[in-house]
Amino acid sequence: MAIRVTFTYSSYVARSIASSAGTRVGTGDVRSCFETWVRPRFCGHNQIPDIVDKSPGSNTWGPSSGPRARPASSMYSTIAREILEEGCKSPLVLGMISLMNLTGAPQFSGMTGLGISPFKTSSVIPFLRGSKWMPCSIPATLSTDIAEVDRGGKVCDPKVKLELSDKVSNGGNGWVNKLLNICSEDAKAAFTAVTVSLLFRSALAEPKSIPSTSMLPTLDVGDRVIAEKVSYFFRKPEVSDIVIFKAPPILVEHGYSCADVFIKRIVASEGDWVEVCDGKLLVNDTVQAEDFVLEPIDYEMEPMFVPEGYVFVLGDNRNKSFDSHNWGPLPIKNIIGRSVFRYWPPSKVSDIIHHEQVSQKRAVDVS
């Protein structure tokens, strides 16, 4: 069975060689191929194969026939012996190496002299596709059509396209941006826990919790904010700042503790006149248009002067806030810090700074 398969395979190779060379293989050619390659390999196990004759008149492919005799390629015979370590000197192996030399050489002067056109490896052995299994044959960017022969003998022409991008990610697409753009609730909570633990009771910032609804809709009950303590060392508190402060003396006199902390928004600074009339807040006779207030004020307040060293504070929820309209201006020295960032809950993480400039107040003069 093995001899039959080997003979059939050898005949197929011989026909392929002859077909590529433009010559039809006949019975004599197949027999010659069998005598030259197959028989010495499989029928002469007890005989040492003849060493290829290196004389000028010898022919590797068959018996010498005068002027058509081709000189043997000693170089490829030597390579074959070196590769196989003298273990196999079969004409079949040497012939295959010579065949590889013919198909891969840049010039085919020996074959063209015999009137045989050059041929490709893929036409000799269809199932050996060098352009596919050779890694070096795939360029960086490739778009080509390759005809394939599958095991069923069907020919297909798929479109094979390989594209390698040469774009290099810059620093702007690194882990910093990923961290800033992260939207996971767990990640925000973890980041908040680390940040607050570092800033807790420090000289730079202090976390605080909102205990009431006096700052709605800006801050809700249970929200937690970070108050920074640095900016007021370099400047005075400004209008629209949300400040955290200790209970002023007037509240301490009425039973509050010095440790009690409040959070309100500054609406007027020292030297201003503040009043509430017809549901509107007026500072220096100017109506204040405040987008963070949801409803008109339902109380009246006579004009009040803010002395030096004081500010006037109100809650954003004007009708439900215990603030300066009840107990008067707030001493600046009682201010602990400015609330700048809400870190809890994670779904509402944001800054709470009012970015409206004091010089660009949306105020309307009273006519």
From Swiss-Prot:
Q: What is its main location?
A: plastid
Active site at S214
GO MF, one term, reads: serine-type endopeptidase activity
**Record carries keyword Thylakoid:** yes
Spans of biased composition, class Low complexity? 62-72
Presequence extent in this chain: 1-68
**What are the protein's UniProt keywords?**
Chloroplast, Hydrolase, Membrane, Plastid, Protease, Thylakoid, Transit peptide, Transmembrane, Transmembrane helix
User: Does the keyword DNA-binding belong to this entry?
Assistant: no
A single GO cellular-component term on record? chloroplast thylakoid membrane
The portions of this protein that span the membrane are: 185-205
Region feature (Disordered): 53-72
Q: Which residues lie on this side of the membrane: Lumenal, thylakoid?
A: 206-367
Q: How does it sit in the membrane?
A: Single-pass membrane protein
> A Pfam family this protein belongs to?
Peptidase_S26
Q: Which reaction does it catalyse?
A: Cleavage of hydrophobic, N-terminal signal or leader sequences from secreted and periplasmic proteins
Return the EC number. Answer: 3.4.21.89
* Domain of life the protein comes from: Eukaryota
Task: Kindly list the places in or outside the cell where this protein is found, as annotated in its UniProt entry.
Answer: Plastid, Chloroplast thylakoid membrane
What is one process in the GO biological process aspect for this record? signal peptide processing
By sequence similarity, the record places it as follows: Belongs to the peptidase S26 family.
Function recorded in the entry: Cleaves the thylakoid-transfer domain from a chloroplast protein.
List the protein's name.
Probable thylakoidal processing peptidase 2, chloroplastic
Q: Which organism is it from?
A: Arabidopsis thaliana
